[in-house]
């Protein structure tokens, strides 16, 4: 009996902590369970999702451009993908839950921008509580965060690692760390959208887990 108990304890001690769920989108098919492509004519070829913004659809959807969505429930997250924006006015990467939670916006704020100057600046926004017309969230502007002209026309790797109320964001050679209560909220959607121009995406990979909120984090 003691031998059996010892073996069970050894197995429990040696067992790895449950890994997060991994989701890979290789963009080789128009349809994939766990991914939605909306508000535009998305093309999926050779492992790349791409779309050219349609001005008429942009107006139809009340100034919202083509979007890719990956719905899944999670708290912590490690996500990475590569994107190539060509003459876009803005590219927006958002984590949603009960409303918006965390957003990364790259914008072209030049007066002579191909699609016109973006009214929305390059920035991060975090919502500690449910977003609304009254709750615009907290704006974060890390130093040296690249804008769209800095990455226009080339493939750029984007990574976001969220653990509790802390996150590390990487865009190309740029990296910043964020600590905010918003990051600890329950999440249920990853979204990538853009306005004007053309956006291509490849090598999308996400590992997520349903760990409880890390109350001990500052």
Predicted stretch roles:
Residues 133-157:
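Short, aromatic/His-centered strand-loop micro-motif at the edge of beta-sheets
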Residues 19-39, 213-218:
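Extracellular carbohydrate-recognition regions
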Residues 171-191:
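Short, solvent-exposed beta-strand-to-loop segments that form ligand-recognition rims
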Residues 31-60:
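Extracellular glycan-recognition surfaces and repeat-rich motifs
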Residues 65-71, 93, 144-150, 190-191:
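Beta-strand-rich interaction surfaces with strong enrichment in secreted/lumenal proteins
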Residues 27, 79-81, 153-163, 167-171:
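Short tryptophan-centered beta-strand motifs in secreted/extracellular beta-sheet-rich domains
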Residues 57-132:
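Secretory/extracellular carbohydrate-interaction modules
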Residues 185-218:
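Ligand-recognition surfaces built from glycine- and aromatic
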């Amino acid at each position: 009996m003691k031998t059996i108990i010892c073996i069970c304890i050894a197995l429990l001690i040696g067992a790895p902590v449950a890994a997060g769920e991994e989701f890979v989108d290789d963009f080789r098919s128009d349809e994939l369970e766990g991914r939605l492509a909306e508000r535009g004519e998305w093309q999926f070829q050779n492992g790349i999702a791409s779309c050219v913004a349609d001005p008429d659809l942009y107006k139809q959807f009340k100034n919202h451009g083509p979007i890719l969505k990956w719905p899944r429930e999670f708290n912590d997250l490690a996500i990475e993908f590569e994107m190539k924006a060509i003459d876009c006015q803005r590219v927006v990467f958002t984590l949603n839950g009960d409303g918006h939670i965390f957003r990364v916006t790259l914008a072209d704020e030049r007066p002579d921008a191909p699609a016109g100057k973006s009214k929305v600046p390059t920035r991060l926004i975090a919502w500690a509580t449910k977003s609304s017309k009254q709750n615009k969230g907290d704006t974060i502007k890390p130093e040296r965060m690249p804008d769209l002209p800095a990455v226009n026309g080339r493939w750029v790797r984007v990574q976001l690692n969220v653990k509790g109320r802390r996150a590390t964001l990487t865009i190309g050679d740029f990296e910043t760390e964020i600590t905010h209560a918003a990051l600890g909220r329950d999440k249920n959607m990853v979204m990538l959208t853009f306005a004007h121009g053309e956006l291509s995406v490849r090598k999308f990979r996400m590992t997520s887990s349903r760990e409880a909120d890390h109350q001990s984090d500052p």
